[in-house]
A protein has these predicted regions:
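Feature responds to low-complexity, polar/acidic, surface-exposed segments characteristic
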Residues: 2-39, 47-100, 106-127, 133-142
Length: 142
């Protein structure tokens, strides 16, 4: 169990540096991952639809990711689709991440901050990512 958790945490941490909100195809057209140390894995994740990129066709693998981007990644990796009926006060229905945050809330691995806010555009910290991953594994094994 410990090895599985550690492996999964390492994979998720690797993905942390490569997440963005708009879909792109894995192809030769993505210049910003050519020669990147994780190029092969990034292409595999794009082919599987787990990893997506920006509207300009870039992946930006060395950028930080937001809380909204991270929960979207978790939802895709773990196949979470059920939607909560209760949205956070700071998440507009028109935003690309609205449904993803509803999925995360329905799954029970996020609670947000006080005053019913999620802060979707804040960069996720490693501590927050580890807490989310631990909660998801708890839900999966429970």
């Amino acid at each position: 169990m410990y090895k599985r958790l550690l492996s999964s945490v390492l994979i998720i941490m690797l993905l942390l540096s490569a997440w963005s909100p708009i879909s792109v195809q894995a192809s030769d057209g993505i210049n910003d991952i050519r020669g990147h140390w994780a190029e092969e894995d990034l292409n595999k994740w794009m082919e599987k639809g787990i990893l997506v990129g920006y509207q300009d066709g870039t992946i930006r693998p060395d950028n930080n990711i937001t809380r909204a981007e991270f929960v979207t990644l978790i939802n895709k990796v773990f196949g979470l689709y059920e939607l909560s009926r209760e949205q956070f006060a700071d998440v507009e229905d028109s935003k690309w991440y609205s449904r993803e945050i509803l999925k995360a809330r329905a799954a029970g691995y996020i609670a947000g901050y006080g005053s019913n806010v999620f802060k979707p555009d804040n960069y996720i910290t490693r501590q927050e990512a580890v807490v989310i991953i631990a909660k998801v594994f708890e839900l999966q094994s429970g």
